[in-house]
């Protein structure tokens, strides 16, 4: 069950990020950007960083795919333990100041920092994964319907269980994971109501 869920989520996230990075590849305005010379694409990872076998790794795979398919120069930066919004703001500012465009924050934890940095760098396009709260012309929200992918994982789990019991581990107690869990449980229930989710 867990492997199918990771493959589904990672595949969807990788494809979505590669397309989003390509779509964000232009600048938010026509003025000023060409004169400073955009370096390419940059992503700032969320907690866990590369090697998390989850959404950060999916983001990295999308970045590498964009680099390979479109020839973009890329940069990626890791989070630090116990970091603050000020640390995130500094990281995003550094990437924008270096000329990376777009700059994508992987995860809703970047929302506060990105809102501030986007205002300081209006000619840089920013993207944020799993957050739709920033209303700025130069910020693209990259929000997924996570409950749809997890529904399919629930279907696969219900079809493959031999014990009529499947498990779900959400990782963190946040609304996004609650939606993921709801989709998973609904997929199990719709496929076989006798299967119990623990």
Predicted regions, residues:
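Bacterial lipoprotein signal-peptidase II cleavage site
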Residues: 6-7, 21-37
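Short, well-structured alpha-helical segments in soluble
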Residues: 85-99
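Hydrophobic alpha-helical
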Residues: 108-116, 120
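Extracytoplasmic "Venus flytrap"
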Residues: 32-34, 41-69, 75-88, 107-110, ...
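Sec-dependent bacterial lipoprotein signal peptides
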Residues: 1-22
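Periplasmic-binding protein-like
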Residues: 97-107, 127-129
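Flexible loop/hinge segments that line or gate small-molecule binding clefts
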Residues: 119-143
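An alpha-beta-alpha
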Residues: 63, 151-198
């Amino acid at each position: 069950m867990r492997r199918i869920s990771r493959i589904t989520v990672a595949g969807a996230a990788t494809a979505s990020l590669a397309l989003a990075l390509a779509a964000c590849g232009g600048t938010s305005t026509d003025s000023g950007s060409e004169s400073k010379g955009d370096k390419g694409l940059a992503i700032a990872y969320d907690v866990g960083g590369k090697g998390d076998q989850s959404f950060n790794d999916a983001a990295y795979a999308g970045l590498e795919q964009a680099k390979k398919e479109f020839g973009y120069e890329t940069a990626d930066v890791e989070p630090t333990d116990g970091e603050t919004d000020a640390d995130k703001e500094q990281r995003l500012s550094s990437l924008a100041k270096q000329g990376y465009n777009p700059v994508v924050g992987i995860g809703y934890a970047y929302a506060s920092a990105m809102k501030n940095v986007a205002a300081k760098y209006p000619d840089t396009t920013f993207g944020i994964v799993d957050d739709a709260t920033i209303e700025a012309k130069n910020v693209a929200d990259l929000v997924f319907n996570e409950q749809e992918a997890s529904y399919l994982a629930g279907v696969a789990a219900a079809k493959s269980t031999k014990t009529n019991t499947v498990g779900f581990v959400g990782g963190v107690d946040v609304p996004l994971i609650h939606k993921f869990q709801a989709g998973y449980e609904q997929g199990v229930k719709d496929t076989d109501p006798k299967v119990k989710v623990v």
